[in-house]
Amino acid sequence: MEKIAIVTDSLSDIPEDLIKTYGIFVVPLTINIDGKSYKDGVDIKKEEFYKLLREGKMPTTTQASPVEFMEVFEDLLKSFDYVIAIILTSKFSGTYQSAVIARDMVDKNRIEVIDSRHFTLGNGMLVLKAARMAVEGASKEEIVSTVYETIPRIRGIMVFDSLDYLYRGGRLSRTQSIIGGILNVKPILTNEDGELKVIDKVRGQKKAIRWIIDYMKNTGIDFAEREVGLIHTDKEEFLNEIEAALRSELEITRFIRSQAGCGIGTHAGPDAAGVFFEEK
């Protein structure tokens, strides 16, 4: 049986217990605050980060470097036959390109680098699928093929309080960001081929939850048999309300719940929540 290591970046926001359970290797991005740099999920705790964010600090992110990936790849190839790295969308960060450079410098034949075209738990769910397959003994080719087949089937819905963080980070135009400043209006965003797009806006959290439920019902999926990802930045009460509605109206019982790390929090702000799932 092939020994396969699964690698991702810190913006996949996989819960720590699942990272340990499946032996996933995470390469952190760098968070910059007031002239100091921190490794996402390593040098700064989420609680401390979101406290700073609510105090008005405006952090930035720096992609993981080729050298950081090289060190991880070289170390893993000492004990694994292959490495599969599933990285957040290349349209959001240069981290994917860093991983590609590292692959080319270490061993192109034993390292596969995949542009997930997703972010946060959209990417995380792909990583978890790959990691579970690796544990079950699937081959490198089987895992890579399944991940590529799954990429277009992952759907994500994010509800933001403000789009200012995305605008300041260069991930959204000024025109798109304006609607987030209207009192109690919740912008709803989704992923379109690796980019965040504002697709609607509603007034208040209850209508945002209703929008999510209606969207998911319209897919025609029997969610009672599906695993659904739930993510929040620093808005757990809102996420609890979303989960309760999903359990009640769609009979969902299997969830991956996570708090977004500093990387996603930098661009989403402290008051965002989202739902991720795989279509048919």
UniProtKB/Swiss-Prot annotation:
Binding residues for hexadecanoate: 61, 93
Signal peptide: none
A GO molecular-function annotation: lipid binding
SUPFAM superfamilies attached to this UniProt entry: DAK1/DegV-like
Keywords of the record: Lipid-binding
Keyword Amino-acid biosynthesis carried by entry: no
Domain annotation DegV: ranges: 4-279
Family annotation (Pfam families): DegV (PF02645)
Record has 4Fe-4S as a keyword: no
Function, as annotated: May bind long-chain fatty acids, such as palmitate, and may play a role in lipid transport or fatty acid metabolism.
Xref: PANTHER family: DEGV DOMAIN-CONTAINING PROTEIN DR_1986-RELATED, FATTY ACID-BINDING PROTEIN TM_1468
Full protein name: DegV domain-containing protein TTE1491
Species of the source: Caldanaerobacter subterraneus subsp. tengcongensis (strain DSM 15242 / JCM 11007 / NBRC 100824 / MB4) (Thermoanaerobacter tengcongensis)
Phylogenetic lineage: Bacteria, Bacillati, Bacillota, Clostridia, Thermoanaerobacterales
